[in-house]
Amino acid sequence: AKSICKEIGYPVLIKAAAGGGGKGMKIVEEEDKLENLFLTAKMEAKKYFGNDELYIEKYFKHPRHIEVQIMSGKNRTVHLGERDCSVQRRHQKLIEETPSPVLTEEQRKDILNKTVKMVEQIGYEGAGTVEYIYENGKFYFLEMNTRVQVEHPVTEVQTGIDIVKE
């Protein structure tokens, strides 16, 4: 873990691999705190999820959480815009906005087009959500959820498309 953290650069976020809901997450600001927080996260992961596997990612101090909703099938992928999920409490989303109030039109077009291209390249079919951390004008890929998320009605209201039906 120490070598990974040095490579990524502090601060880092230790997360439960099987986690969710902010459980099993620890922010490590400096190396001398790593061992204790790593063990604590491991115990919490086992307790909450029955799996003590962890992963480490860069921690962003003032991030925006941007999600791109996609639908893909029959050799065609389309985006249904983005959602800004940055208003959170304990790593749980409270408010979803679409379109994101912090992106310029150029940034929006860029991330939407790059997301469609990525989904096409991996050959994914179905509804999905590609998540990014956005900070200081840069996007960092977080994950892709290959299912319809609870937030999908925000996109449905904005686009008029019934994602589940489609």
Q: Where do the model's predicted regions map?
A:
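Gly/Ser/Thr-enriched, mixed-charge loops and adjacent short helices
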Residues: 3-7
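ATP-dependent carboxylate activation and anion-phosphoryl transfer catalytic cores
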Residues: 8, 16, 21, 28-166
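N-terminal cofactor/phosphate-binding cores enriched in small/glycine residues
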Residues: 13
